[in-house]
Amino acid sequence: MQETFIELVPRSASSLCEEMRQVEQMDISFQGYNLPELKRQKSSFLSPEHMMQMRKKAELSPEKKLALHLRTQERNVVENIERVRLMAMHGVDIALLVTGDAFDPGEEPATCAHNVLDGITVPMGGIEIAVGADLYMKQWGRWGHKIPAIQKGIVGSTFTQPIFHPQTLASLHENIGNFLPEKVYAGITWISNAKSREYWHRKNNVPAEFLPSGESDETIRYNSISQSADILRLVRQQGFSQYVMLMSGRLEELQQIFSLSENIREH
């Protein structure tokens, strides 16, 4: 069954709860939330442990599914596995293991996500384990190391980098089978300005021709919203689940993308 998740930025407990309240008042059908573990040198965000406690207290929309990211690189394998078990005890549905970006670009992560998977010998009860798929790296980065855990049924799903172009979506179909877990959540987001567009191209290796065109920020945003609506429609037509990343976008733009995707589908 297809599912739609909404990814929100957990800046604070109050802002997260308020955004959830606003999203649930919109005319959008979705099944869950995807909340990242973020670390920035000049910003603070809620930790997964804080969000677990909020979930246990029913402060995080108990009627919706919840996927939480776990950055693996700052902890050893045993500590990461214990965090997954803790998630299961606090009502989290999906543990998304991601290595995470290092503060120092030249720093090698101490523990990659696949190292944690190697330490899990059987599927864990009470929680689904997911991994990220970096669609813009050669051979999807370290993806080959994750395949054994997929084949053993330890990994149940993957959340992809945002898809900006149908050509990227086609690559998912080429790798269905032993290469991908049963459920794929295709990432979707939109770009608000030229600086953000440059970030996706330079930092995340998205081909420039896949990104929205435009000279002004207003034109880039308009084109990106339309492009994201097209991708959302295609993802649904092709049977993938999806998660839509709010990031720095506005809630009314999120509503617009869903509305446009429905309108396009009708024609």
Language model: regions and residue ranges:
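Active-site pocket-lining/capping segments in soluble small-molecule metabolic enzymes
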Residues: 5-27, 96-103, 107-136, 143, ...
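Glycine-rich, proline-tolerant flexible connector loops at the mouths of alpha/beta enzymes
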Residues: 27-53, 97-110, 155-171, 175, ...
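A structural motif
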Residues: 30, 92, 155, 181, ...
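Conserved, mostly hydrophobic/aromatic
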Residues: 33, 87, 150-154, 186
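Flavin-dependent oxidoreductase catalytic cores
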Residues: 44-64, 77-79, 125-127
